[in-house]
Amino acid sequence: EVLEQYEMELLSVRKGRGAWICETDKGLKLLQEYRGTVRRLEFEDQVLEKLDTRGSLRVDRYVRNREGALLSKAGDGSNYIMKEYFPDRECNIRDHYEIRLGISRLAMLHGQLRQIQPKEEWNMGSICVESLEKEQERHVREMKRARNFIRGKRGKTEFELCVMDTFDYFFQQAKEALDQMNNLFSESKPSGQLAAAELSTEDLERQENSLGYLCHGDLDQHHVLMGNGYTAIIEYNRMHLGVQAEDLYRLMRKVMEKHGWDGDLGISMLDSYERVRPMDKKERKCLYYMFLFPEKYWKQLNFYYNTNKAWIPAKNTDKLKNLKNQENARRRFLERLEKE
């Protein structure tokens, strides 16, 4: 009954992951339940329709129903959305060429998103998210909270002993990253922000208004699909105003962890991005401070604190040990990144 609300001929339907993949006379579409707001949907649609997808970049745009609405209601009252569907496989993060290609397409996406001016009606929580420095500040507090809890415990588990052994080292990195990030975004021009001469008029206006640029917001290899002659970057439900370097960081970090912090690969990914969209000094510093912050370490501590502390799976202890083992390679990459 929901499918009947769309102006297209249905050829076949098959169940996907929590959705229906529909073959129609207008190409492949994806129908899925939606629990968000119409306002959020309209925001995403307004942005995606402005992107030029005639070349090597594709996005999963929404399809409006016969009434011109983005949301379609089923008989039971549940809401559904339809969007373009790409059957292509995910970016293989073990393939250096494919990684670099995916990252160059991300730069292409970012370049287009930078041309889109924020609108007054976009002022909602899901778009104006927590800033990078506030997020790091919260993570530092959470690390301390977990360490203080463990320190007060008797009869520590292997995981807890591992935390006590490594905490000071990683906490120092977290503090340094936070302090530098705060300086970077601080209001005091001489110590924190780049000199006005280094910024364009548009960048200065955005800086004064505390606005960032549109970012994907949840980027990993699962959202980068490699098609024949194009790359589809999908799932914009976490798109927000912020620092675009965060998208690059998320994808790069996933790759670097898989490749044992291979410095040559890391720098080549950065080159692939900057050939399409060069970053300014502030963005590069921001990227460096994101990498300096021990996010994987914080994740393990936060997982521990928020779950059953009496039993921590062995794989979590192994993850902490792996972080320690990979640290020399990670530090070498950080040194190279800082010099870029």
For the regions a language model picked out, list residue spans one by one.
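Active-site acidic catalytic loop and adjacent metal/ATP-binding pocket
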Residues: 20-23, 62, 178-246
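Active-site activation/catalytic loop segments of kinase-like enzymes and analogous catalytic loops
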Residues: 245-278, 291-310
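ATP-binding pocket architecture of kinase catalytic cores
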Residues: 27-124
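ATP-dependent phospho-/nucleotidyl transfer catalytic cores
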Residues: 12, 32, 122-214, 268
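A glycine-centered beta->alpha junction motif in the catalytic cores
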Residues: 80-93, 144-153, 251, 293-311
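ATP-binding glycine-rich phosphate-binding loop
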Residues: 2-24
